[in-house]
Curated annotation (Swiss-Prot):
Record family assignment: Belongs to the LpxK family.
GO molecular function: ATP binding; tetraacyldisaccharide 4'-kinase activity
Pathway(s): Glycolipid biosynthesis; lipid IV(A) biosynthesis; lipid IV(A) from (3R)-3-hydroxytetradecanoyl-[acyl-carrier-protein] and UDP-N-acetyl-alpha-D-glucosamine: step 6/6
GO cellular component: plasma membrane
Protein name, entry field: Tetraacyldisaccharide 4'-kinase
BP term (GO), one: lipopolysaccharide core region biosynthetic process
Assigned EC number: 2.7.1.130
Enzyme class, UniProt record, top EC level: transferase
Binding site for ATP: S54, V55, G56, G57, T58, G59, K60, T61
Catalytic activity: a lipid A disaccharide + ATP = a lipid IVA + ADP + H(+)
Source organism phylogeny: Bacteria, Pseudomonadati, Pseudomonadota, Gammaproteobacteria, Thiotrichales
Amino acid sequence: MIDNIWYKPQLGILSYILSPIAFIFSKIAHNRKIRLQNNQYKSKIPVIIVGNISVGGTGKTPVVRMFANQYLEQGKKPVIISRGYGAKAEKYPFEVDSKTPASVCGDEPAMLFDALGGKVPIVISPHRVDSVKYIEKNYPDADVIISDDGLQHYKLARTKEVVVVDASRMFGNGLCLPAGPLREPVERLKSVDQIIAIGNLDNQNYSELLNYNSNIVRAKIKATKFVNLVTKQSILIDSFYGKSIDAVAGIGNPDKFFSSLDELGVNIYHEHIFRDHHKYTPKDFEHFDPEQIVIMTYKDAIKCKDFAKSNWWYLDIALEFC
């Protein structure tokens, strides 16, 4: 896979060949940024962008969930906007509700709505400004708009920018697409308000981040409980210690999920890896042993709940600051 090339210690020959294109890409991205910033839409409601400068999963959605919960605990009214990757809504902006399947609104919005108990309005649209205008009209008393991703959506003015970094992978070879994993040059970090580094941030990587920004928060993803897809029963995190299970992951970085299960002492009999944003059907599980316990990510569970078996569980997680 191309991301394996991006994250190799040495610059691979393919990345070297693509580096001129990456240079052109970064220049185009920079010019686009300036053009859009000159005609930004500024909302009266504060906007917090939770994004990243690299492609793939860095942990943005758990951060969005954490921010939303914090505002709820403070008695405030947050609203979330999202691109809704893979969404098939009939019209946009589209507001998610309890009956909206992930196939209509996208994986992350469906998961966030479920995780937050429907207490936070979630609006999706390919054009975030349209979502903001929808919120201004329908939720004029909202205290804050949290954008799940959208750092590069410069048409929308923002009050605060938070960049999420995978502390274990950092920025790979440091090149922009397509030669590397970066959407923007790493120097972009100099202008953001905060960096949240998720995972094991060693001294070398911490020093690298300090070259660009001093407001760095260390965090880790903590497993909190297992939840049954059918009954919604929650059980303790050590409930499957020493037990053999099938693990299912259709996320940007499945190894993280498998490592989490390993750390919990779960014996993974088989790792089933699907593409990120995979649209599950019962056929995907026809070859599974019906007696074997299945554990998947929350994001996958949202798409499997309609045909789940009684021995299917998902691992719930939370962000914990170090």
